[in-house]
Amino acid sequence: MVTEVTEGIKVSVTTRFMEDYSNPENDYFIFSYQIRIENQNPFTVQLLNRHWEIWDSLSGKRIVDGEGVVGQLPILESGENYQYESACNLDSEIGSMKGIYTFKRLFDGTQFEVAIPIFYMEVPVRAN
């Protein structure tokens, strides 16, 4: 698990290789990632947008931007957390993701950015 706190928002990420959905013979590797977002501020916030930088050891870097996460614009009161799971496909056995969430403070409408810590996706080594 990797964790980072920015502007009072704690973001934790875990990953796993999805062997049943991958096809290594065709350079297709699926990884799931689980994210937990905790509001450690004394005020309510709302997640508005996400920005991902996805790196693949064969294909290089790609950018993904979008509204919210998994179709949601979660609102987190002080002390609350929000968890979700998503997936990423790579063309190789090794890659990484990092990014930024844009949040809004509901008491005054100001927006701020929160770092999503870099996390690595690697196919587990098999012992013979």
Predicted regions span which residues?
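Short, solvent-exposed loop/turn segments enriched in Ser/Thr/Gly
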Residues: F29-Q34, K98
